[in-house]
């Protein structure tokens, strides 16, 4: 897929409800291709709910998602996005290499498999020496890096990442920041939640809090 398919993405008056309770309301922001958008907030402020609504994994109670100035259905973005959950979930009894081969076949199609590229993604995340080890033997940080390695195998323009930095030390956070910037330079769009300072100059922050009323957007914070 051409990484400039989405020229602009607008979230308009999105409201999230969980267990008949309003978690957040009237969320509004607009992003251009090449944008990195970071969502911050305390536990319970609705970060994961918002990300899943944008991804089409949860229904929105009101509001619109607008792509290239066109209103779209909730499922429209699924073909253009990659969603990463905050909690790694794997088939634990297979090797790292077999897992990525299986995932790549399922996600990208058999004809698109490049075993060399898969091995390269493991190398870039410092996991090549573990490629024949079972996932069950990995630490939390290693599992998170395995999850991140899938970003290097996807051609999706929109990345939606829920707390991707949990379990990473400073060195791997720096490597991950480089991956994010490279994707943005190619015309990608990233929406992610994190409490960690990435020290990336060009980004936008959305601040959520648990009152469901105060929402602040800060452009080019650093």
UniProtKB/Swiss-Prot annotation:
Cystine pairs: none
One Pfam family of this chain: ABC_tran
Highest taxon of source: Eukaryota
Cytoplasm found in the keyword field: no
Residues the entry annotates as binding ATP: 41-48
Annotated GO CC locations: mitochondrial membrane
Membrane topology category: Peripheral membrane protein
Subcellular location, principal: mitochondrion
GO biological process, one term: cytochrome complex assembly
Domain ABC transporter: residue ranges: 9-222
GO molecular function: ABC-type heme transporter activity; ATP binding; ATP hydrolysis activity
Compartments where found: Mitochondrion membrane
Gene3D superfamilies: P-loop containing nucleotide triphosphate hydrolases (3.40.50.300)
Catalytic activity from the UniProt record: heme b(in) + ATP + H2O = heme b(out) + ADP + phosphate + H(+)
Cited InterPro entries: AAA+_ATPase (IPR003593), ABC_transporter-like_ATP-bd (IPR003439), ABC_transporter-like_CS (IPR017871), ABC_transptr_haem_export_CcmA (IPR005895), P-loop_NTPase (IPR027417)
Keyword RNA-binding: no
EC number annotated for this UniProt entry: 7.6.2.5
Subunit structure of this chain's protein: The complex is composed of two ATP-binding proteins (CcmA) and two transmembrane proteins (ccmB).
Family: Belongs to the ABC transporter superfamily. CcmA exporter (TC 3.A.1.107) family.
Name of the molecule in the record: Cytochrome c biogenesis ATP-binding export protein CcmA
Species whose genome carries this gene: Reclinomonas americana
Gene name for this UniProt entry: CCMA
